[in-house]
């Protein structure tokens, strides 16, 4: 990655941070596909070629965008509580909120990622949350990876629902209403007793998406806690 400011040439009229902020604004509004060097030059009022004095190209910009968003995963003044469950729960909730604000980062979260300042800070902090539990380092990495995989998977489903709403104009309840005629035939057939129970008994608990996220996360943390080494092991 190129230095923050060019060593030679005219005085810069913008910074790498401004370029990154402009790219994030565009991606938040229109998606990652809208990012191009020409578009970013227009956004910040600069010539397209001048951008190459700060970044090597679009891939470089995307790396800067990701690192800037990852910075929001952790509050700048974060102090760990010493309660690994509470700390991981808070981290998972914050990561979910950040990804929902920047949906374009979701498909990039599970890919190979370049080392960068905020990624390193986030990883180090997450590992400190589970340090001292009697786990090997590989087990610590697996715990952190499992929690992040849960968050990413849950958020992907939320984003898919948001896209379905945008595409159809129907929210989930309106869409479900359209399924009623077929589901009535399912009930009448008597062939699917568990589906009948779902239709008659379900739908009351964990309707709120935030509640469902918290429920699944807590069950995941329960499973991790159950596998922790016990004193004297």
Task: Show where each model-derived region lies.
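Hydrophobic alpha-helical bundle segments that form small-molecule/ligand-binding pockets
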Residues: 122-144, 148-178, 202, 224-227
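Amphipathic alpha-helical segments used for helix-helix packing
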Residues: 66, 96-121, 125, 156, ...
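Alpha-helical structural segments
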Residues: 18-25, 30, 60-76, 86-94, ...
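A structured, mid-to-C-terminal "fold-capping" secondary-structure block
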Residues: 170-233
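Hydrophobic alpha-helical connector segments
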Residues: 75-121, 137-140, 144-147
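Short hydrophobic/aromatic patch on the recognition helix
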Residues: 46-55
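N-terminal intrinsically disordered/low-complexity leader segments
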Residues: 1-14, 81, 190-200, 232-233
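Basic, helix-initiating cap at the start of DNA-binding domains
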Residues: 1-39, 43, 56-63
């Amino acid at each position: 990655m190129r230095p923050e400011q060019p060593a030679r040439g005219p005085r810069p009229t913008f910074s790498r941070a401004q370029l990154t902020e402009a790219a994030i604004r565009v991606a938040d509004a229109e998606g990652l596909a809208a990012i191009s060097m020409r578009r970013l030059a227009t956004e910040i009022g600069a010539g397209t070629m001048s951008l190459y004095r700060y970044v090597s190209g679009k891939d470089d910009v995307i790396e800067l965008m990701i690192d800037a968003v990852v910075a929001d995963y952790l509050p700048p003044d974060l102090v760990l509580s010493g309660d690994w469950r509470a700390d991981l729960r808070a981290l998972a909730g914050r990561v979910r909120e950040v990804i929902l604000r920047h949906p374009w980062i979701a498909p990039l979260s599970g890919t190979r990622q370049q080392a960068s300042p905020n990624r390193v800070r986030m990883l180090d902090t997450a590992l400190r949350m589970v340090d001292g539990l009697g786990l090997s380092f590989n087990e610590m990495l697996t715990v952190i990876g499992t929690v992040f995989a849960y968050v990413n998977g849950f958020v992907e489903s939320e984003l898919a629902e948001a896209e379905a709403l945008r595409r159809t104009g129907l929210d989930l309840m309106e869409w479900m209403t359209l399924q009623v005629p077929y589901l009535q035939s399912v009930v009448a057939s008597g062939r699917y007793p568990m589906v009948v129970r779902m239709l008659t008994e379900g739908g009351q608990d964990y309707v709120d998406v935030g509640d469902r996220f918290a429920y699944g996360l807590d069950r995941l943390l329960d499973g991790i806690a159950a596998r922790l080494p016990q004193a004297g092991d």
